[in-house]
UniProtKB/Swiss-Prot annotation:
Belongs to the 4Fe4S bacterial-type ferredoxin family. RnfB subfamily. GO terms for molecular function: 4 iron, 4 sulfur cluster binding; electron transfer activity; metal ion binding. Keywords: 4Fe-4S, Cell inner membrane, Cell membrane, Electron transport, Iron, Iron-sulfur, Membrane, Metal-binding, Repeat, Translocase, Transport. The complex is composed of six subunits: RnfA, RnfB, RnfC, RnfD, RnfE and RnfG. The lineage of its organism: Bacteria, Pseudomonadati, Pseudomonadota, Gammaproteobacteria, Enterobacterales. This is Ion-translocating oxidoreductase complex subunit B. [4Fe-4S] cluster 3 binds at C127, C147, C150, C153. GO terms for biological process: electron transport chain. It is an enzyme of class 7 (translocase).
Length: 192
């Protein structure tokens, strides 16, 4: 019994000593994080979709803060995120990356053809924002409020029952198409 007590005390003291050494080393040799990278990363939507050309939001934030990468490449964040990053970095806002259609992007949503869904859960595993709900061997569905339209759930589906479609127009996302309004110059008479 005496040997067990000695062993427990010795191991406790060793664990305490090594814990203190590790604690000291972690503070002494800590690498300082760039606060600008953290701030840019907080502004990004954290969908980890890769549409910007980087494997996730953190690498894109590092490229923007340290390497001067363009601030307009986050498709899910769109113009609001680009404006916030421009304000944070004190740079001029840029037009969104891509063609003219990207300036007013159409919100895309994943839609599951539910009768053809086999419930394999591969789309659930691929979704970075947990917008797909369902269970193994049960029908899955997409929560449209959470879906960012990142397209990461489409390829893993073995039955190709997922596709991206434009979001339905509602009063929340409707915008007036100014190109449909006829513009006429109205002559104004000048009175003396």
């Amino acid at each position: 019994m005496e040997m067990i007590v000695i062993a427990v005390v010795a191991l406790t003291l060793l664990a305490l000593l090594f814990g203190m050494l590790l604690g000291y080393a972690s503070r002494r040799f800590a690498a300082e994080e760039d606060p600008v990278v953290d701030q840019v990363d907080e502004l990004l939507p954290q969908s980890q979709c890769g549409q910007c050309g980087y494997p996730g939001c953190r690498p894109y934030a590092e490229a923007v803060a340290n390497n001067g990468e363009q601030i307009n490449r986050c498709v899910p964040g769109g113009e609001p995120v680009m404006q916030k990053i421009a304000t944070l970095l004190n740079v001029e806002p840029q037009p969104l990356d891509g063609d003219a259609a990207m300036a007013e992007p159409v919100r895309m949503l994943a839609v599951i053809d539910e009768p053809n869904c086999i419930g394999c859960t591969k789309c659930i595993q691929a979704c970075p924002v947990d917008a797909i709900v369902g269970a193994t061997r049960a029908m899955h569905t997409v929560m449209s409020d959470l879906c960012t339209g990142c397209n990461l759930c489409v390829d893993p589906c073995p039955t190709q029952c997922i596709e991206l479609r434009p979001a339905a127009t509602t009063t929340d996302n409707w915008k007036w198409d100014l190109n449909t309004i006829p513009v006429r110059n109205i002559p104004v008479e000048q009175h003396a």
